[in-house]
């Protein structure tokens, strides 16, 4: 595309204001470094996700329900919530890092998988380094089980556990 980055940024801001998309920013303890990294973009209407990859559509679905859940906690309970993703210089990435703002509750990391049952190596990597609760949501999963400190849960069970 022959569009300036400034124009693309403006278009994204317009789409956000129209509630067509939302951004998930990178988590980093150093805010200056987090600002330099690109956000992930998700659609509020998953019907707009035009991808042949069912995993990408599923990740968008989980992101949508997670952001709704966190907004619900902010609006009804007054909690200070946050939703991010994590990616380091070595290329390790986890789909979501979030805090619910509930007193005494640790932040959580979440990896979304369409069919894989074994624990994601990146989820294990960040769980050990950040000492957070870790969950892997599996679309085609049919039972909940533990992989060490990581809980693998079917999508239907995870979505049912959210407030809205």
How does the language model describe each region?
Residues 4-14, 19-20, 24-164:
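A cross-kingdom feature that marks ATP-driven nucleic-acid transaction machinery
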């Amino acid at each position: 595309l022959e569009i300036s980055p400034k124009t693309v940024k403006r278009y994204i801001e317009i789409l956000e204001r129209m509630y067509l998309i939302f951004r998930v920013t990178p988590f980093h303890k150093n805010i200056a470094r987090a600002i330099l990294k690109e956000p992930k973009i998700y659609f509020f209407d998953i019907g707009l996700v035009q991808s042949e990859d069912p995993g990408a559509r599923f990740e968008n679905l989980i992101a949508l329900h997670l952001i709704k859940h966190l907004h619900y906690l902010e609006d009804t309970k007054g909690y200070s919530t946050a939703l991010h993703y994590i990616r380091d210089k070595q290329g390790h990435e986890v789909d979501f890092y979030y805090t619910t703002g509930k007193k005494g509750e640790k932040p959580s990391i979440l990896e979304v998988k369409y069919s894989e049952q074994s624990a994601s190596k990146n989820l294990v990597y960040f769980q050990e380094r950040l000492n957070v609760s870790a969950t892997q949501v599996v679309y085609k999963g049919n039972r909940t089980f533990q992989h060490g400190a990581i809980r693998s849960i079917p999508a239907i069970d995870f979505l049912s556990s959210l407030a809205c």
